[in-house]
Amino acid sequence: MTWFAFFLTFVCWFNFAPFATTIGKQLNLTPEQIKTLGICNLALTIPARIIIGMLLDRFGPRITYSLLLIFASVPCLATALSQNFEHLVISRLLMGIVGAGFVVGIRMVSEWFPPKEIGIAQGIYGGWGNFGAFGAEFTLPTIAVAASFMNGGASNWRFAIALTGIIAAIYGLIYYNSVQDTPVGKVYKRPKKNGALEVTSVKSFWALIISNFGLIFALGLLAWRLAQKNIHFLTQSQMYLVWLLLAGLFAYQTYKAYQVNKELLIGKKTYPPSERYQFRQVALLEFTYVTNFGSELAVVSMLPAFFEKTFGLEHVVAGMIAAAYPFLNLISRPSGGLISDKFGSRKWTMTIISGGIAVGYLMAHFINSSWPIPLAIAVTMFAAYFAQAGCGATYSIAPLIKKEATGQIAGNVGAYGNFGGVVYLTIFSLTDASTLFSTMGIAAMICAFMCGFFLKEPKDSFAGAYEGELAETPTKRSTIFTEE
């Protein structure tokens, strides 16, 4: 049930992309405005994933996911009722909050599966959930055409988008009444302090502050983009006001982080070796998620138009080709987790896959209209496989860093995926597709080197149970599957 909850959040999150061209024509949007809406769709997911991670660790996945699914109906209906660019900006910013749903399932899955199986379990969850992007790309246009009789014969995109929100809200109620946070007899571990991530060294505290600044920077970049002359959504004075508010948010985050970690910083508290972790490892996973999921977000948003314009294809044909990218998640993301489980080293799995991402996008840089279309598709799918397998490999490591803070760590890592999406799409909006592909390829190459030199193998990566828990007997495991 959890993967389907994730699937629905992705259907909602990406329900605009299949209709971008149609909506642009009906509401007289410029190409720059359509690109900007793609960035808006990702923006609030950045802080939302961190906030959702905190709520998740405190209240559990059952309550958190249920409320998020019900909330999804709000931006879906707002998008369906939009009459101009300003309405769409607001609705897509709100939709970014729905994109934070992924984090919830990471904690839920980690509660039900031991470390030795976490890679494939998280991969299946993520693969089927990300399949929602394909579901939106492939099925929503069909629904819109089928409902055209309610729209004077024209594609009824408003009905299709509204329907996704209604279904999500209904499933939110079903989810709340059908799942539990942990197997029977297992205690849901909560962090001792709330409001910010608890770190275990002074160096990690400063690394956390730098990490928080990066996310604020991405939001500031979006504000700058919305203030450009060809967008006309924010004035210069409004942009400066947004920057001031973001500076205040950063100051508040820093204050909360200080409150949570005050005893450590003033020397009153030290952590025993069994409780320590390096935030540097979280930061490296954040970078890996920039290069894999961040690039996936960017490519999913621009690929239909890329094939349409590069090869002169019909919109429907280009959309079906582009839909193969998220469709591949069914295979690639679980395989990344499975390889991480079976290869014997999660570190080197992450390193090699990051290198594959680099090769794929650097090859995609050279795609142009002279290429045979099948070859262009093959190169795109090569890059897609490694990017999506990288997501699976990243989240085969994230839940193993500090169990009781899994929600917050997953939220931070996930937020940087959206950071990557915002930065990459901003680069794309200012340049072209070949520049975007080369930028993503170079970033992945740097990431591969950093993982090879600095990423550490998590403690007890392939254990039968988390530290402090008894290994589950076969009988208990079968009970878990039955009760799910």
For each feature predicted by the language model, list its residue ranges.
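Extracytoplasmic
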Residues: 1-31, 47, 136, 299-304
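Extracytoplasmic gate region of multi-pass secondary transporters
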Residues: 16-17, 208, 212-242, 280-323
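Helix-breaking motifs and short loop linkers at transmembrane-helix boundaries and internal kinks
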Residues: 28, 60, 81-86, 98, ...
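Helix-to-loop junctions at the C-terminal end of transmembrane segments
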Residues: 48-60, 332-345
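Cytoplasmic membrane-interface "Motif A"-like loop-to-helix N-cap segments
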Residues: 58-69, 341-355
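C-terminal ends and interior cores of transmembrane alpha-helices
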Residues: 70-83, 355-370
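Glycine-rich segments within core transmembrane alpha-helices of 12-TM secondary carriers
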Residues: 119-145, 168, 411-424
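C-terminal membrane-cytosol helix-exit motif in multi-pass small-molecule transporters
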Residues: 165-188, 212-228, 246-264, 448-458
